[in-house]
From Swiss-Prot:
Keywords: Heme, Iron, Membrane, Metal-binding, Monooxygenase, Oxidoreductase, Transmembrane, Transmembrane helix. Its main location: membrane. One of its GO terms (cellular component) is membrane. Its cofactor is heme. Heme binds at C440. One of its GO terms (molecular function) is heme binding. This is Probable cytochrome P450 515A1. It comes from Dictyostelium discoideum (Social amoeba).
């Protein structure tokens, strides 16, 4: 009897794998000489209930995707519990999919836990006409608020951080810059959104601020532990209510700021007063929109998405950049030589600093803060480069793998800014902010922040490791791919 059960299980596993991998490509998609080549991508063995989840590391999922890519190809398939999934590990294929075929891939794949973070009314998880209108208004508001005042905002917040650092190094010149980068970004985003900022000295911060940070950390801990998103029989054991609770706690932190702006802003768009912050621009654009798709009540969800995206991507990238510059002091010195100019550069001067730009690009390439992007859904059957992607498939771009796809394997894990100074720069590329209609609308703002802060920070300070051992370049995956905590010694440059 036991032998029969085992045999039956093997037959069942065989049949579900045959059904999954041997999919018939619709005849309407079979054209030209490639009819016989076109197929659904291969992948690891599927098991009942869990699918291919046994192949994924909870600690390093991006590395699991890369290893599976090495075995099954740059585009492979797997079953994430009950969800049919295709993972893209090739930057050229990603461009052909998301950039060249946006109508097939512009929609977000909705995992159940996503609903409890704004009911799909924000910029990150939204879909359809609401999301398209929101993106248009957001992009328009960012464009209108991008000005010399924004650059002054970045510099003002940087100088506050520099003043804090100068005091700090006199007390204990053994500094973890990670929290400081996060505070710089949080202050820039809050000043940008609401016209307010926070102190750098933790002793001067309010209990509401600490409550926000605590809820923010808990929220992403819960999101990282949601097996019920993939395995339906585990739904009774989900903690979606905890996600909703911590998310609402985060919203409560800046709701008073939104209320204050709404109270003080005029209902008359032609009152002649210049908007004082981004949110005033944004509210003005909402009021002008005749479709009424975006509501004032959506503002907390939108603000949360902007703050989280900015902190996770930009501050983490700045932390990684510092790690590499302390590991490779010759690169740091070459950077200093380029940025040691009499004046503070503006964003319009960016092209005059090719080495700094290449360092930022290389940091995003080798250590992308979001090693794999949030999932998309393929909304109709499509064939790209002889690879069949069926309708309703979850599509995950493995940014970590894509950023290594056009570089020789011996060089792909080596930090080398010269990658982006060579004649092959356009062929190398990096896709930290993705491609197509879902490309981060704040990518240019993030780029401005990293450029402007770096031109001042690395001109004022030289950073050294506090030990002879190199800082760990592998990092760990929490809400983002982050470096392990490391400390630096700061030397004021004369």
């Amino acid at each position: 009897m036991i032998l029969g059960i085992i045999l039956g299980l093997f037959i069942y596993i065989y049949l579900i794998n045959i059904k999954f991998f041997n999919r018939a490509v619709p005849s309407s998609l079979l054209v030209g000489e490639n009819k016989l080549k076109c197929k659904f991508p291969s992948g690891p063995l599927i098991l009942p209930i869990i699918g291919s989840l046994y192949k994924l590391s909870l600690k390093y999922p991006h590395l699991s995707f890369k290893q599976l890519s090495d075995k099954y190809g740059k585009v492979f398939s797997l079953k994430m519990g009950s969800i049919d999934t295709i993972v893209i590990n090739d930057i050229n294929f990603l461009q052909k999919s998301f950039r060249d075929n946006p109508t097939f891939f512009s929609q977000r794949f909705h995992l159940p836990s996503f609903y409890y973070m704004g009911k799909y009314q924000g910029i990150i998880f939204g879909n359809g006409s609401h999301w398209r209108k929101l993106k248009d208004i957001l992009s328009s508001s960012i464009t209108k608020s991008k000005s010399r005042q924004m650059e002054e905002l970045f510099y003002n917040e940087y100088f506050k951080a520099e003043e804090y650092l100068l005091k700090k190094i006199n007390q204990d010149n053994n500094i973890d810059m990670g929290p400081i980068f996060k505070r710089i970004l949080l202050n820039i985003l809050y000043r940008f959104l609401f016209g307010v900022s926070f102190e750098y000295d933790d002793n001067l911060l309010s209990k509401e601020f600490y409550s926000f940070i605590q809820s923010y950390n808990k929220l992403f801990e819960y999101l990282a532990k949601q097996p019920a998103d993939f395995i339906p029989i585990l739904k009774p054991f989900n903690n979606y209510k905890e996600i909703e609770k911590e998310y609402n706690n985060c919203l409560n932190f800046f709701q008073p700021l939104i209320d204050n702006i709404l109270k003080n802003i005029s209902d008359d768009d032609d009152d002649g007063n210049e908007p004082k912050c981004f949110l005033e621009y944004f509210i003005s654009e909402i009021r002008k929109d005749t479709s009424n798709l975006i509501k004032i009540t959506d503002l907390p969800y939108i603000c949360f998405d902007i703050i989280v995206a900015g902190i996770v991507t930009t501050s983490t990238t700045m932390d990684w950049m510092l790690l590499y510059l302390t590991n490779y002091p010759n690169i740091q010195e070459k950077l200093f030589f380029e940025i040691n100019t009499p004046n503070h550069p503006l964003h319009k001067d960016k092209l005059q600093f090719p080495y700094l730009n290449s360092i930022i690009k290389e940091t995003l390439r080798i250590s992308p803060p979001a090693p794999f992007a949030l999932p998309h859904i393929c909304t109709d059957d499509i064939v790209i480069d002889d690879i069949f992607i069926p309708k309703n498939t979850q599509v995950i771009p493995n940014i970590y793998g894509c950023n290594r796809s056009n570089i020789e394997s011996s060089e792909s894990n080596v930090f080398n800014p010269d990658h982006f100074l060579s004649k092959d720069e356009l062929n190398i590329g990096q896709c930290a902010f993705s491609f197509g209609s879902r490309q981060c609308p704040g990518a240019n703002v993030a780029d401005s922040i990293m450029f402007l802060v770096s031109t001042k920070l690395y001109k004022t300070f030289k950073f050294e490791r506090t030990t002879t051992q190199l800082n760990d370049e592998n990092g760990h995956f929490t809400r983002s791919l982050s470096p392990f905590e490391f400390k630096s010694k700061l030397i004021i440059r004369k």
